[in-house]
UniProtKB/Swiss-Prot annotation:
Annotated compartments: Cell membrane
Lineage, opening ranks: Bacteria, Bacillati, Bacillota, Bacilli, Lactobacillales
InterPro entries: Rce1/LyrA-like_dom
One GO biological process term: CAAX-box protein maturation
The keyword Plastid is assigned to this record: no
Keywords: Cell membrane, Membrane, Transmembrane, Transmembrane helix
Transmembrane segments: 16-36, 43-63, 81-101, 169-189, 206-226
UniProt protein name: UPF0177 protein YbdJ
Family: Belongs to the UPF0177 family.
UniProt-recorded Gene Ontology molecular function terms: endopeptidase activity
One cellular component (GO) term of this entry: plasma membrane
Topology of the protein relative to the lipid bilayer: Multi-pass membrane protein
Amino acid sequence: MIERIKKFLRTKFKPLLLLLVTVILYNGWTPHLGIFPPTFYDFAFNYYGFVDILTFLVIIVIAYKNDAFKKIFDIFRPKNLLFILFFIVGGNIFIALAHHLYFQMTPALEAFPEHSIDLANYFARTPFWTHSLDLFVIGPISEELIYREYLYRLFDKKCLACFVSVTMFAWVHTGFTYSFFLYLPISLVVTLAYHRRKAIGESIALHSSINLINTYLPNLLSFWVF
């Protein structure tokens, strides 16, 4: 038993700590979590863009120091570029078809996740550059570090890590509601992009592309941003 604890501390404690620290830096300064004193949240609200960028830079430095981006430049190899293109096109088509089926089978009042409503409210009260930065840079990079890079490091079996990653990403965004099945195909596609060779650059590119298509090309693919 003692040896197992020592082994856990030696191999799994660091990625668990990285995951928790990144979650706090990414989401911890939002008021509904109540982690920090009210005065901090007042400051964060008044200087939202500054706090957002500052915490993101800390996330990037921590990730870089812990080799999260060691395969990042491999993304420019022809084989990997073709893979990303395939996943962007094929993945988005799969998601659109899955969501079409979802909306056919789900009661109207249950179809739209609260997270999507929160995002719509967020768009209305923040400048264009701020929510664009969140949607296409900060959000995808931070969430891929949390749900793919660090979460995968906690498991010795890659297939188990894939299952947990897919489930956790969808659940955190929706809870166990009907809309869980709205986010599930998105989570599956992005996780599989990472799963192939555990390269975070590819899942970030796919994550950002899904947000981009969903935000600016709603008539092409009808699914909700994550």
